[in-house]
């Protein structure tokens, strides 16, 4: 099975790129780290009091994510889909069977960490580095529509999340991968994809 990790700050286009890749391949599946936030009372309380909670590792349910990741990797199938509800702070589970999986795409703000802990075999890593203002516009539109935030709150949360994303890797040495690509606004995506699948 081919593993692809896609990382980048909020609003950089990770989900869009993942869907574009899925459209070009057969038997692929996307695991979004956005659907693996912790739930329950403690998580609800922390989300109120910890600044940038959803951008920090303490919010990520790594155990549940790893369980699903390993199941797909070991069996080549997925039997359920998870979707995190940001307003209710719950994970909805849906039965959705996918068989003969040949490509597993992990995308989200925690994908970089996941690639270093779960990518113990050959994998490709794509990091999106997109203009900050462009990312902020996308996040505001999404948060107004899907997450019930005011424009001011969406702006403030984005600026904090941007800083958190880049600060958490500032002093960490992350092993370089031979199949690592940096995606900017000027990148020819089709060329990158052709290298991924050659």
Q: Across the structure, where does each feature detected by a protein language model lie?
A:
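Hydrophobic anchor at the beta1->P-loop junction of P-loop NTPases
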Residues: 6
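The conserved Walker
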Residues: 10
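Conserved lysine of the Walker
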Residues: 14
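Short beta-strand-centered segment that lines the nucleotide-binding/catalytic pocket of NTP-utilizing
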Residues: 27-42
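ATP-dependent NMP and nucleoside kinases share a basic, alpha-helical "lid"
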Residues: 92-148
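NTP-dependent small-molecule kinase module
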Residues: 98-101, 141, 163-198
């Amino acid at each position: 099975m081919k593993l692809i990790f896609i990382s980048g700050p909020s609003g950089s286009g990770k989900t869009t790129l993942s869907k574009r890749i899925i459209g070009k391949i057969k038997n692929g599946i996307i695991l979004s780290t956005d659907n693996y936030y912790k739930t329950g009372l403690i998580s609800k309380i922390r989300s109120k009091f910890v600044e940038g909670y959803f951008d920090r590792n303490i919010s990520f349910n790594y155990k549940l994510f790893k369980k699903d990741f390993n199941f797909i990797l070991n069996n080549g199938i997925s039997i359920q889909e998870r979707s995190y509800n940001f307003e209710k702070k719950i994970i909805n589970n849906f039965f959705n069977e996918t068989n003969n999986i040949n490509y597993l795409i992990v995308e989200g703000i925690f994908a970089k960490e996941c690639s270093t802990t779960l990518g113990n075999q050959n994998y490709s890593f794509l990091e999106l580095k997109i203009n900050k203002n462009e990312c902020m516009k996308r996040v505001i539109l999404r948060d107004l529509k899907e997450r019930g935030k005011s424009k001011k709150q969406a702006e403030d949360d984005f600026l904090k999340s941007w800083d958190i994303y880049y600060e958490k890797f500032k002093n960490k040495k992350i092993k370089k991968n031979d199949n690592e690509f940096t995606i900017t606004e000027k990148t020819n995506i089709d060329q990158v994809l052709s290298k991924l699948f050659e």
